[in-house]
Amino acid sequence: MSDTVISLISHSITTVFYLVPLIIALIIPFSLYSGFRRKSKTVAFFHPYCNAGGGGERVLWAAIRTMQKKFPDHKYFVYSGDTDATKEQILLKARQRFGIELDPSNIQFIYLHWRTLVEARHYKHCTMLFQALAGLILALEAWFRMVPAVFIDSMGYPLSLPAFRLSGSKVVAYVHYPTISCDMLDVVESRQETFNNSSTIAQSNVLSWGKLTYYRLFACLYWLAGKAAHVGMVNGSWTQRHITSIWSRRDVSIVYPPCDVEAFLNIESVAESLLEDTKTVRLLSVGQIRPEKNHKLQLEVLHDVKEPLEKMGYNVELCIAGGCRNEEDQERVKMLKNEAEKLDISEQLIWQLNVPYEDLVVELSKALISIHTMHNEHFGISVVEAMAASTIILSNDSGGPRMDIVKDYEGHCVGYLSITKEEYVETILKIVEEGLKKRNDTRKYARKSLTRFGEAAFETHWNKEIEKVL
């Protein structure tokens, strides 16, 4: 071993030797000071993008609503980065988007001004690490503003967990998706090209090794963060499998997201009338405009299915009801519109961005088929809602839809799964060709299968877990 390597190891050991007591010296006063500031009977949700209007926000508002009813003697807070929205505006959006009414007298918003730090656009390289560290900074801002008795990370900022554990708060994690998963490690190790593993890296031995090392080190950090939670909850089987593996804990419970099944069951579908009277096959995609949602595949499917449907005597339309959170999402919409122009499908494409709840209900009532294309969707609230609303679901054959939702019920088909563009096109044609009776059978058993995803089930399981820390 060279003198340089020995010197480097020696310096590293010395650095650690001095750092450990320094960290301990900082932690002790931090914990003591936090104890003086901690407010009893307070529950705070760390959800910097609480006004985004996605599935994660449905969980947030439903959780607060059920806790307001079950534990009215506690006070509820939300750490929010939506500094441009008032409390009234945020609660109004929760009601309009999800139909969820909250008691405004028992909820306060604590505004965080450093939210921009966690946005991926700032970090072109080592994005996960820098976002995690930025999340820690944001958590420290939250800590500075208030230390609650119970801290709930409902959005997935792992380093917020040890920060509030050290402050003496009871810590709860509700994980929608793992920051890093076994699948991500496998993709890099097998050198597959995906949206988060570029061809440049996949084709290079050195870069693949470097990224795999980085992922493994980050997985260790994620493991440490996960150990800080007193209670761990996940949204489905896929997420549970990865979290139990990476966090090395077996006490992580599945609490399915609250799907407003009853409300969607009451939607009166007019899809068959549209099919019969106007010869229109209406497709619907519901989901935020994010890269992993793979809207580009939906456009390609629309392009490829258009001609064979026309030969069968049908028109086809695709409505994309997507949530746009920021400028990055708006840019993706522009790119998708340009792609639609190239594919000559703009006339068949309908955009409904940041759609209110009432308008979403209308779109669901008109849709014959709901199309979902995200690979390894962690759960899939939109999939459940689509099935409840009597649309025929065509989902990606992976993640939560495959493991939890689109599974035969009492031996009967409840929907369809596909992976490739060709499979999606083939399945759409099959659904149209199979006839009204078969489609109605699929709808009937799909709707029967959804009781386990209702709001009542969510409230029961959520309160059971939360009681452990109250």
Curated annotation (Swiss-Prot):
Transmembrane annotation, as ranges: 16-36
Membrane topology, from the record: Single-pass membrane protein
Major enzyme class: transferase
GO BP term, pick one: protein N-linked glycosylation
Intramembrane region residues: 132-152, 379-399
Lumenal side: 1-15
Function as written in the Swiss-Prot or TrEMBL entry: GDP-Man:Man(3)GlcNAc(2)-PP-Dol alpha-1,2-mannosyltransferase that operates in the biosynthetic pathway of dolichol-linked oligosaccharides, the glycan precursors employed in protein asparagine (N)-glycosylation. The assembly of dolichol-linked oligosaccharides begins on the cytosolic side of the endoplasmic reticulum membrane and finishes in its lumen. The sequential addition of sugars to dolichol pyrophosphate produces dolichol-linked oligosaccharides containing fourteen sugars, including two GlcNAcs, nine mannoses and three glucoses.
One Gene Ontology MF term: GDP-Man:Man3GlcNAc2-PP-Dol alpha-1,2-mannosyltransferase activity
UniProt-listed Pfam families: ALG11_N, Glycos_transf_1
Catalytic activity: an alpha-D-Man-(1->3)-[alpha-D-Man-(1->6)]-beta-D-Man-(1->4)-beta-D-GlcNAc-(1->4)-alpha-D-GlcNAc-diphospho-di-trans,poly-cis-dolichol + 2 GDP-alpha-D-mannose = an alpha-D-Man-(1->2)-alpha-D-Man-(1->2)-alpha-D-Man-(1->3)-[alpha-D-Man-(1->6)]-beta-D-Man-(1->4)-beta-D-GlcNAc-(1->4)-alpha-D-GlcNAc-diphospho-di-trans,poly-cis-dolichol + 2 GDP + 2 H(+)
This protein's GO CC annotations: endoplasmic reticulum membrane
Gene3D superfamilies hit by this protein: Glycogen Phosphorylase B (3.40.50.2000)
UniProt keywords, alphabetically: Endoplasmic reticulum, Glycosyltransferase, Membrane, Transferase, Transmembrane, Transmembrane helix
Cytoplasmic face of the membrane: 37-131, 153-378, 400-470
Record protein name field: GDP-Man:Man(3)GlcNAc(2)-PP-Dol alpha-1,2-mannosyltransferase
Family: Belongs to the glycosyltransferase group 1 family. Glycosyltransferase 4 subfamily.
Gene, per the UniProt record: algn-11
EC nos: 2.4.1.131
Pathway note: Protein modification; protein glycosylation
The species this protein was found in: Caenorhabditis elegans
Subcellular location: Endoplasmic reticulum membrane
